[in-house]
A protein has these predicted regions:
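Mature extracytoplasmic or organellar-lumen-exposed domains after removal of signal/transit peptides
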Residues: 1-231
C-alpha cells in the first residue's frame, strides 16, 4: 500500500520517507517497526488463508519479501538471522502452492519464533516505541482503506488489521514482563489496541464499525506516550 514504506528511514539512508514516518526515528525502532510490518502481513495472510480467501492470503504472504525485506536485510545478517529471508520465502511459496492450513500455520510459527529471537536483541523501550510507530503505519493504511467513509480498499484494511494483531500479541507478552516499567507501559499499549478495535469490523471489513482513521492515530499517540514510561 501507499503508506507501506513509512517506517524504513532508519535502515537505508532515507529510504521510504512515506507518510507517517518521523524523520528522526531511531534506527533500532525503525528496524523493529519494519519487522512488525512484515509479521503483520503474514498474520493477515494466515487469517485470510484459514478463512479460505486464498487469493488475498497469497498477496499478503508475498509482501514482506517484495516490499520490506531489503530494508531489514543488512541488520538481520549482522544479528545472525539472515535465514529469515528463506523462511518467509518458503512460507509464501507454500501459500502459492495452496498447501494445507496446518502446514502454513506451522511455517508461520517458525517465522514468528525467529522474529521473537531477533527481538531479544532490543530493549523493551524500543520495542514499545515500535508499536506506536507501527500503529501510525496502520493508521496510514487504514485511511486509504476507508477513504470517503466507506470500505474502499480491503487490502489496506487487511494490512492495518494485521499490524494491530502483531502489536496486540507482542505488547501482551511484554505486559507479563518482570520489568515493572515495561510491563505497565505494555499494558497501557494493549488497552490502546483494544480501544482501536472500534475502527474494525471482521477480517474482511464487514460489520458495524467506525470508519475513522483518527481512532488509530489517537491510539498511536497514546502508545507513544506510554512507551516513554519504559525508559
Amino acid at each position: 500500500g501507499e503508506g507501506e514504506a513509512a517506517a524504513s528511514e532508519g535502515e537505508g539512508g532515507g529510504e521510504g520517507e512515506g507518510e507517517g514516518g518521523g524523520a528522526a526515528i531511531d534506527p533500532d525502532v525503525a528496524f523493529l517497526t519494519d519487522l512488525g510490518f512484515m509479521e503483520g502481513h503474514l498474520r493477515a495472510g494466515l487469517a485470510l488463508y484459514e478463512a479460505g480467501d486464498l487469493s488475498a492470503a497469497k498477496t499478503h504472504m508475498g509482501h514482506p519479501i517484495e516490499e520490506k525485506y531489503e530494508a531489514v536485510a543488512k541488520r538481520l545478517d549482522q544479528l545472525g538471522y539472515g535465514d529469515l529471508r528463506e523462511q518467509i520465502s518458503a512460507l509464501a511459496a507454500a501459500a502459492e502452492a495452496e498447501d494445507s492450513y496446518e502446514k502454513i500455520a506451522e511455517m508461520f510459527g517458525k517465522v514468528r519464533q525467529t522474529h521473537e529471537e531477533v527481538r531479544t536483541n532490543f530493549d523493551a523501550a524500543d520495542q514499545l516505541k515500535s508499536f506506536a510507530a507501527l500503529t501510525r503505519v496502520a493508521a496510514d493504511e487504514y485511511a486509504i482503506a476507508v477513504e470517503g467513509g466507506t470500505l474502499a480498499n480491503v487490502k489496506e484494511y487487511h494490512d492495518a488489521w494485521g499490524f494491530m494483531r502483531v502489536i496486540e500479541a507482542e505488547a501482551g507478552e511484554l505486559a507479563a514482563s518482570d520489568d515493572a516499567k515495561a510491563s505497565d507501559a505494555a499494558a497501557a499499549i494493549v488497552e490502546q489496541v483494544e480501544a482501536a478495535g472500534s475502527a474494525f469490523g471482521d477480517l474482511q471489513g464487514q460489520g458495524d464499525y467506525e470508519k475513522d482513521p483518527s481512532i488509530l492515530y489517537a491510539a498511536a499517540a497514546r502508545m507513544e506516550l506510554a512507551s516513554l514510561g519504559a525508559e
